[in-house]
From Swiss-Prot:
Compartments where found: Secreted
Gene Ontology cellular-component terms listed: extracellular space
Disruption phenotype: (Microbial infection) RNAi-mediated knockdown results in increased dengue virus type 2 infection rates and increased number of infection foci per infected midgut following infectious blood meal.
Organism: Aedes aegypti (Yellowfever mosquito)
Disulfide bonds: C31-C56, C33-C52, C41-C76
Effect of R35A: Abolishes inhibitory activity towards human plasmin. Abolishes suppression of host plasmin-mediated increase of dengue virus type 2 infection in mosquito midgut
Annotated protein name in UniProt: Kazal-type trypsin inhibitor
Lineage start: Eukaryota, Metazoa, Ecdysozoa, Arthropoda, Hexapoda
Domain Kazal-like: start-end pairs: 25-78
This protein's record includes keyword RNA-binding: no
Pfam families to which the protein is assigned, alphabetical: Kazal_1
């Protein structure tokens, strides 16, 4: 019976470490995204290959610090000349 308690304790510790590691990967901008090219434009005027990669960057420390957002469901190069219309303004 004691072995089962030790096993459960080790399993619980491993699960906690796995969750903490996964969270820190997302905060560093490391995400498992599909390799599908459906470009989107971020408020930093950078084109991301797909929405998942942009969301990953948005959830990173740098993305949160810069208030990164999606401004268009297309490549930034394809936006009209008046890009400021797409960027959300803070009031």
């Amino acid at each position: 019976m004691r072995h089962i308690g030790v096993f459960v304790g080790v399993l619980a510790l491993a699960l906690v470490l796995l969750v903490v590691e996964a969270r820190s990967d997302a905060e560093r901008g490391v995400c498992a995204c599909p390799r599908i090219y459906m470009p989107v434009c971020g408020s930093n005027l950078k084109t991301y290959n797909n929405d998942c990669l942009l969301r990953c960057e948005i959830n990173s420390d740098l993305g949160r610090a810069n208030n990164l957002r999606k401004i268009a469901d297309q490549a930034c190069d394809n936006l009209t000349d008046n890009v400021n219309d797409f960027i959300p303004q803070e009031y």
